Amino acid sequence: MSVSEIFVELQGFLAAEQDIREEIRKVVQSLEQTAREILTLLQGVHQGAGFQDIPKRCLKAREHFGTVKTHLTSLKTKFPAEQYYRFHEHWRFVLQRLVFLAAFVVYLESETLVTREAVTEILGIEPDREKGFHLDVEDYLSGVLILASELSRLSVNSVTAGDYSRPLHISTFINELDSGFRLLNLKNDSLRKRYDGLKYDVKKVEEVVYDLSIRGFNKETAAACVEK
């Protein structure tokens, strides 16, 4: 085989991979659009009237996750399953965003932390890498940290809306998250930096709870602060 033939063959490989990446990008763009629609829907809970609409908004968000499943099913067909991490960078950020959105829905519904397995059911993907297109542990953790930031914001807006007990519940939840993350030995630089922001979320919520307690808005809040 001549030198030119070798490079022609290599160009064929490069072109084929570029085609794969282009197909992946198209699906990821659709995922990003659906994620924006879900986020817009859930952002309504930060508004005064949005608190009464939480069940309705969560139900509607779950309907949108049906579209997410369809897009992810399509994405799985665009590349060989064993090459997941070769193309992972294309969908990593939108998948983390979808984890956050799924976690936010579950929290609004039950004030609990969604498990990684439950997220994979919502998204229609696998929990284990051996089974193909899956939810990487670090992507799950990143999504959970985005949730913490969103909840710290919700604690402030809850007070504005006159819901004085919600910040206490959020404070308990975020402190439990912080305790959980302290058990992990995080090696991923991006994840570790994002975790550094969790302490600010914890502090922000604690300040809201403390402010409520000294102003006497909520007996439950005040009692909890006295116990501390």
Curated annotation (Swiss-Prot):
Family membership, please give it.
Belongs to the translin family.
For the biological process aspect of GO, one term held by this record is: siRNA processing
- Annotated region Leucine-zipper: where? 177-198
| MF (Gene Ontology) | endonuclease activity; identical protein binding; RNA binding; sequence-specific DNA binding; single-stranded DNA binding
N6-acetyllysine: residues carrying this PTM? K187, K199
Q: Which CDD domains match?
A: Translin
Q: Which UniProt keywords apply?
A: Acetylation, Cytoplasm, DNA-binding, Endonuclease, Hydrolase, Nuclease, Nucleus, Phosphoprotein, RNA-binding
Gene3D superfamilies xref list? Translin, domain 1, Translin, domain 2
Q: Which residues, renumbered to this chain, carry the PTM Phosphoserine?
A: S190
Q: What is this protein called?
A: Translin
The UniProt function text for this chain reads:
DNA-binding protein that specifically recognizes consensus sequences at the breakpoint junctions in chromosomal translocations, mostly involving immunoglobulin (Ig)/T-cell receptor gene segments. Seems to recognize single-stranded DNA ends generated by staggered breaks occurring at recombination hot spots.
Instruction: List the source organism.
Output: Bos taurus
Task: Tell me which EC number(s) this protein carries.
Answer: 3.1.-.-
Predominant place of localization: cytoplasm
Which intervals of the chain form a coiled coil?
A: none
| Subcellular localization | Cytoplasm; Nucleus
For this protein, the record's InterPro entries field holds: Translin, Translin_C, Translin_fam, Translin_N, Translin_sf
Q: Which GO terms describe its cellular component?
A: cytoplasm; endoplasmic reticulum; endoribonuclease complex; nucleoplasm; nucleus
How it assembles, according to the record, is: Ring-shaped heterooctamer of six TSN and two TSNAX subunits, DNA/RNA binding occurs inside the ring.
Region annotation (DNA/RNA binding) maps to 86-90
What gene is behind this protein? Answer: TSN
